[in-house]
Amino acid sequence: MLSKWIILFLIWSLPFGQDVIGEGLYEDELIGFLQENYKTSTTLGYTMARDTMYLRIDRIDGQVKGIYTNYSLTLPDGVDPSTHLYQNGSSNGINCEHVWPQSLYEGGEPIKSDMHALRPCKNNVNSARNNKPFDESTDTQTITWYWQNSQTSNIPSSNIDEYSENHESYFEPREDRKGDIARTMFYFYTMYSDIADEYFFEGQKEILKTWHAQDPIDEDEIARTWQIADYQENKPNPFILDATLVERAYFYDGILIGDLNEDGLLNILDLVMLVNIILYDEDGSPAADVNGDGAYNVLDVVMLANIILSQN
């Protein structure tokens, strides 16, 4: 009974409108559409882009926080942002993380300065991540755990989801930033696939898709991409505006997960159909298993609701 009321509450909470980018397009055709409409040819140049990110995009209440650790430094007015945050290169400083490593693409500007792919990062964590791919790290195989200003080689006894993990071969961001990282990676490869390392992307694609679903788009992420767009030809990261793009561009096999009425859209009608499948034990299509766990339950409803909400 509780599950039923949770499901009904989710439906009542949903708005009916939604924005669909490249409606009816899939795979290469959709990727081409995204490149044509969302790829910027104008950036600020790396020095100005980095300072703008620190001062105008990611300074909140006077603080700049690292993407992987939530570690923060105060950034006052009237100082050089990059110099002040860098702290002479100490481990407690903050520098600029290229979420897609610079060593894994060919070319300079405007790619290097595209703020959709840049994030503030604690100096020593940036060095630890280096150019490693993203993936899940088994706790017992994690070399170092990072959170705020602390690092440890021992499995944390509390707040474990707040830590990012450095493995010998890959890097795992903290739980509530995995979706942000995934959508950045899909953006970068989509816009710059002609020069980005294809094998680097293909090796991470599946886990990035999972993270995109598990850590859905939120209002802060939407606000940030539009702030960046103000400096880059009014072009946001489309993967933050339409949660269906990841699957439609890179995983489409004729079935759009969550599209139960097969109209090419994810909306309230699909949610109603999913609820009926769960409540009345009806046979469902593969599209109903939104979280990919092999079952139809309230978790699928929550995930589909998050996807629909993120498109509004």
Segment roles from a protein language model:
Residues P15-V20, E247-N261, Q311-N312:
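Low-complexity, Pro/Thr/Ser/Gly/Ala-rich linker/spacer regions in secreted
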